[in-house]
Amino acid sequence: MERKIYTITISIILLISVRIYGNDKTEIYNAYIRNDMAGWKKIMDRIQNQERKSNEILLSLVNYQYGYIGWCIGEANEKEAEFYISLARNNLAVLESNNYNLSMVYAYYAALYGYDIGLSIIRAPFIGPKSMKYAENALKLDQGNSFAYLQMGNIQYYMPSVFGGSVNEAIRYFLQAKVLMEKNKETILQDWNYLHLLTLIVQAYTDVEDYRSAKAYCEIILKIEPQFVWIKDELYPQVMHQFKN
């Protein structure tokens, strides 16, 4: 009898966790398309402060922290970025000790080292190889890890050409990540990561002055999410201006 009650209790907890996880994903997506980073931070901090988190929820939290850190660096809010990099690393250490989805864990380590470079470019020669190594190890563990391909793309995108960086090579990695993401149509529905990847592709095509492709991807994004503020109000008008001229 006690075992039956225990099983039912665990099932209820898991069901509640799944529902909360789904709600968090939707709320983060809505914050992303509206550029509501205050709302994003509120969701992220609430999850961080939960006493008990499953491995799945903890990995999702790292994803939200990853997105927020990138925004902080873009806004030159270095102290905030450093704070959340530290939190994300602690969360990854827990996941690594639990031997949970190590391919994703390594891909996030690669991303965090990339952020370290963004905060201090002079550290690039020392940190850059670590970022690359983690991304490569992530792919060794799982060739189907789209996020690891995205990180390989980021490494190529931000690495100076004198050190081997290439925007065209970055595009190749981004497109590979896109193919892998799109294999599971359900997971990319209302997924900020998918829109973010498509936006990176727009930016990369713009950088190599392939405005036709950049325009096409802007229109793909707006078809998926017409209310995506960053594309609708900023990138698409900029791309159209370049395309027409």
Question: What are these language model-derived features?
Answer:
Residues 46-60, 91-105, 136-145, 178-191:
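Flexible helix-coil transition and linker loops at the boundaries of alpha-helical arrays
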Residues 28-35, 70-83, 115-128, 158-171, ...:
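Short coil/turn connectors between adjacent alpha-helices in alpha-solenoid helical repeat scaffolds
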